[in-house]
Amino acid sequence: MTTGSKETKENYIPSAEDSQQRGMNRREFVTAAGALLGTTATVGLTGANAQSAEAGKGSDVKRASPGHTETRPVTNGGPWDAALKTVREWDPKWAETCEKMTMNPWRKSVLPRKIIELISLALNAACTNLNQDGTRRHINAALDAGATRDEILMVLKMASLLSIHSCSLGAPILLEEAKAAGVQLAPRKTGEATPACDKMREMGQWNQAWDPFYELDPAWTDEFFATALGVYASGVFTPKEVELFSIALDASYTHMYAPGTRRHIKAALKLGVSMEEIMEVLKLCVIQGVQACNLGVPILAEELEKRRTRKS
């Protein structure tokens, strides 16, 4: 599907054939559609080289060679805002060491600058974080790095759909505890149409982890999958890039969703993503911890100034 196409509708579920006509092959479609939803696709290609080459089609992102760590100049503050200047004044030694560590991905070329900023955006905008200042900072930095409106919007959609893990956690517990308490679901209509879920089953991509919330509310589950399929089959990002974003969202310190982290690391490796690239994503997760300083240091400075003023 062409970026920004008006063809996508609310509950449109693209078929593999539709995706081929829009520049995606079946493997790319299945991989992209299953990314956030917790599936791994291995359709039609064998061998890491073939997978890697296919995954890169249609991408304008220049890939760094695995293990290549050429130093490059930093043109922005990375994860930092003005708080860094204050930290330098208060504790220059710690500020120097912390800045060196946190700016590492921006100084190295393991990942393209645009992808670094989009991953950082995902971490800040995620429904488990909702950091307004960080979201604005990395949207601006991503635009400066060449990201398009549709790419940024896609990251925000992914950051929104992360919330499905509430059902991944809670639905099995609800069924178990209801059974123990002797409580049963109220009768409902049989034969409800669930085309999105049916599509996933046809492709062999249905995950049994979804069975509990499908059992509890099949119609709503299908609505969710229709939403997710419409997003991930768009072709805005390559399957490799989708997996990197998914790893970041699941491994984030505000989420720490182990099943998804493992699933997406496994899928990324199968697609030819290097260990170094995946480690960069994990580093970016850790580095966003300096948001504590971005938040707290200005408040501390303000409160200290108020006390100083009252005493004088």
Predicted feature residues:
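Short acidic/histidine-centered micro-motifs embedded in hydrophobic/aromatic stretches
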Residues: 122, 155-159, 177, 248, ...
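Short helix-coil transition sites and intra-membrane helix breaks within transmembrane domains
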Residues: 127-133, 163-167, 253-259, 290-293
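Amphipathic, charged-and-aliphatic alpha-helical interface segments
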Residues: 116-131, 241-257
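Acidic, glycine/proline-rich low-complexity segments that act as flexible tails and inter-domain linkers
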Residues: 2-23, 28-44, 51-115, 144, ...
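A cross-kingdom feature marking solvent-exposed beta-strand/loop segments within repeated
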Residues: 136-145, 150, 265-266, 270-271
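Hydrophobic, ordered structural segments
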Residues: 153-175
